[in-house]
């Protein structure tokens, strides 16, 4: 069984290696481990040995090999023990000198100053994250409040927008265009006052305060449209004109307005601003400059 494990010598690059076979089974039985090196026992010096060593240390702190061997013979100890004793004695002497001269006192002082440095560094680090002054802290909240006041329907004043009311007669859609682009009153008010959608057209000058039917931006034109334009416009909201969609896509200028003189509610473009007609027998619906 062990014949194939213990292989004979073999040739490597034509060179025959002579020798006995190696046991490939690294068992603890076949290879006894070396015993662990025992720790050297602590040397205990007697009073007489210490007196001899101290007398030599008083002469010189660094004895040469001959002095150490001579002292080792006197105290009956190996020279290596004498050498170690001198090394320890020199270290003890240096420690005593440092304590006597006060060189060891600044070390605790340095340790005391290190927490102060850490405190200063922490203070500087915390200073970077100090809260802004009260005036600066209010700025984000005021900005958020301004954003809410623009886009939130609850914060919009219920007062009707003059621009959305005044542009209703001029910008109302006819039956040829389907009424599918209705918007909420809050959304139309947020865009109704923008002058970029109406290039030079000041429809606020044509506001007629004589009709209470247009007091709310979301009210319909059914009382007026039933008598003048037919029932096909009774479901169109008055705030449809303030979308910014019709004004920007049609490209109205300062002289553009829609005419409802025709009862079929057809679009008539490119005529003077003086051609904007009134409704309901020209008696109760008159445009006047405010």
UniProtKB/Swiss-Prot annotation:
Initially expressed in the Spemann organizer region of early gastrula embryos. Expression then becomes localized to the anterior region; confined to the cement gland anlage at stages 19-25 and localized to the forebrain, optic vesicle and otocyst at stage 28. PROSITE patterns: HOMEOBOX_1, HOMEOBOX_2. Residues 94-103, 116-129 have a biased composition (Polar residues). It is found in: Nucleus. Keywords: Developmental protein, Differentiation, DNA-binding, Homeobox, Nucleus, Transcription, Transcription regulation. Its main location: nucleus. Residues 38-97 bind DNA. This is Homeobox protein otx5-A. It comes from Xenopus laevis (African clawed frog). The gene is otx5-a.
């Amino acid at each position: 069984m062990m014949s194939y494990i213990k292989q004979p010598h073999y040739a490597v690059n034509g060179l025959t290696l002579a020798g006995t076979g190696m046991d490939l089974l690294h068992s603890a039985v076949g290879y006894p481990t070396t015993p662990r090196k025992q720790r050297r026992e602590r040397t205990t010096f007697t009073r007489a040995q210490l007196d001899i060593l101290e007398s030599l240390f008083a002469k010189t702190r660094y004895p040469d090999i001959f002095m150490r061997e001579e002292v080792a013979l006197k105290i009956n100890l190996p020279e290596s023990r004498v050498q170690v004793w001198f090394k320890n004695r020199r270290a003890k002497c240096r420690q005593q000198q440092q304590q006597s001269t006060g060189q060891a006192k600044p070390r605790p002082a340095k340790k005391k100053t290190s927490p102060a440095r850490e405190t200063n560094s922490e203070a500087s680090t915390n200073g970077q994250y100090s809260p802004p002054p009260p005036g600066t802290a209010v700025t984000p909240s005021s900005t958020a409040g301004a954003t809410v006041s623009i886009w939130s329907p609850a914060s919009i004043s219920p007062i009707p927008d003059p621009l959305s009311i005044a542009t209703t007669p001029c910008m109302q859609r006819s039956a040829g265009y389907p009424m599918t682009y209705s918007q909420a009153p809050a959304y139309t008010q947020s865009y109704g006052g923008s002058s970029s959608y109406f290039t030079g057209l000041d429809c606020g000058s044509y506001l007629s305060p004589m009709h209470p039917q247009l007091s709310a931006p979301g009210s319909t034109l059914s009382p007026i449209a039933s008598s003048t334009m037919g029932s096909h416009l009774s479901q169109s909201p008055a705030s449809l004109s303030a979308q910014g969609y019709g004004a920007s896509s049609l490209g109205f200028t300062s002289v553009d307005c829609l005419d409802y003189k025709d009862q079929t509610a057809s679009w008539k473009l490119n005529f003077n601003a003086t051609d904007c007609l009134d409704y309901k027998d020209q008696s109760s619906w008159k445009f006047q400059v405010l």
